[in-house]
Protein backbone atom coordinates (compact mmCIF):
# COMPACT_ATOMS: atom_id res chain seq x y z
CA UNK A 1 0.00 0.00 0.00
CA UNK A 2 2.79 2.40 0.93
CA UNK A 3 4.64 1.59 -2.31
CA UNK A 4 1.58 2.45 -4.39
CA UNK A 5 1.11 5.74 -2.51
CA UNK A 6 4.72 6.74 -3.17
CA UNK A 7 4.43 5.88 -6.88
CA UNK A 8 1.24 7.92 -7.19
CA UNK A 9 2.82 10.81 -5.29
CA UNK A 10 5.84 10.86 -7.59
CA UNK A 11 3.59 10.66 -10.65
CA UNK A 12 1.46 13.58 -9.46
CA UNK A 13 4.54 15.61 -8.63
CA UNK A 14 5.97 15.04 -12.12
CA UNK A 15 2.63 15.92 -13.66
CA UNK A 16 2.50 19.21 -11.74
CA UNK A 17 6.07 20.05 -12.74
CA UNK A 18 5.28 19.35 -16.38
CA UNK A 19 2.14 21.49 -16.24
CA UNK A 20 4.15 24.33 -14.69
CA UNK A 21 6.73 24.09 -17.51
CA UNK A 22 3.99 24.21 -20.13
CA UNK A 23 2.32 27.22 -18.59
CA UNK A 24 5.64 29.08 -18.39
CA UNK A 25 6.30 28.29 -22.04
CA UNK A 26 2.94 29.71 -23.05
CA UNK A 27 3.59 32.90 -21.13
CA UNK A 28 6.97 33.34 -22.75
CA UNK A 29 5.59 32.77 -26.24
CA UNK A 30 2.76 35.23 -25.58
CA UNK A 31 5.28 37.81 -24.40
CA UNK A 32 7.34 37.29 -27.55
CA UNK A 33 4.25 37.86 -29.69
CA UNK A 34 3.48 41.13 -27.90
CA UNK A 35 7.07 42.36 -28.29
CA UNK A 36 7.10 41.43 -31.98
CA UNK A 37 3.84 43.32 -32.49
CA UNK A 38 5.29 46.37 -30.72
CA UNK A 39 8.45 46.15 -32.83
CA UNK A 40 6.40 45.98 -36.02
CA UNK A 41 4.63 49.18 -34.98
CA UNK A 42 8.01 50.90 -34.55
CA UNK A 43 9.31 50.91 -38.10
CA UNK A 44 11.22 53.71 -39.71
CA UNK A 45 9.20 56.24 -41.62
CA UNK A 46 10.61 57.11 -45.04
CA UNK A 47 9.82 60.83 -44.70
CA UNK A 48 11.20 61.23 -41.14
CA UNK A 49 14.74 60.57 -39.92
CA UNK A 50 15.20 59.91 -36.21
CA UNK A 51 18.43 60.30 -34.20
CA UNK A 52 20.35 57.32 -32.81
CA UNK A 53 18.41 55.50 -30.07
CA UNK A 54 15.09 56.71 -31.44
CA UNK A 55 12.68 55.18 -33.90
CA UNK A 56 9.67 56.43 -35.78
CA UNK A 57 6.26 55.42 -34.46
CA UNK A 58 4.25 54.56 -37.56
CA UNK A 59 0.94 55.59 -36.01
CA UNK A 60 1.94 59.03 -34.71
CA UNK A 61 4.75 59.70 -37.24
CA UNK A 62 6.95 60.97 -34.38
CA UNK A 63 10.38 59.92 -33.11
CA UNK A 64 10.29 58.04 -29.81
CA UNK A 65 12.98 56.43 -27.69
CA UNK A 66 12.96 52.75 -28.54
CA UNK A 67 13.44 51.44 -24.98
CA UNK A 68 10.72 53.70 -23.53
CA UNK A 69 8.21 52.84 -26.22
CA UNK A 70 8.51 49.09 -25.69
CA UNK A 71 7.92 49.23 -21.93
CA UNK A 72 5.38 52.09 -21.56
CA UNK A 73 2.38 49.85 -22.25
UniProtKB/Swiss-Prot annotation:
Expressed by the venom gland. Residues 26-37 form a propeptide. One of its GO terms (cellular component) is extracellular region. Its main location: secreted. GO terms for molecular function: potassium channel regulator activity; toxin activity. Residues 1-25 form the signal peptide. Exhibits highly specific blockage of Kv2.1/KCNB1 (IC(50)=41.7 nM) voltage-gated potassium channels. This blockage is not associated with a significant change in steady-state activation, suggesting that this toxin acts as a channel blocker rather than a gating-modifier. Shows potential analgesic activities in formalin-induced paw licking, thermal pain, and acetic acid-induced abdominal writhing mice models. Negative results: Does not affect sodium currents in rat DRG cells. Shows little or no effect against Kv1.1/KCNA1, Kv1.3/KCNA3, Kv1.4/KCNA4, Kv2.2/KCNB2, Kv3.1/KCNC1, Kv4.1/KCND1, Kv4.2/KCND2, or Kv4.3/KCND3 potassium channels. This is Kappa-scoloptoxin SsmTx-I.
Amino acid sequence: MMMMFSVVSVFLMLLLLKFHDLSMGEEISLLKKVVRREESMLLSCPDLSCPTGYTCDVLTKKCKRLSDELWDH
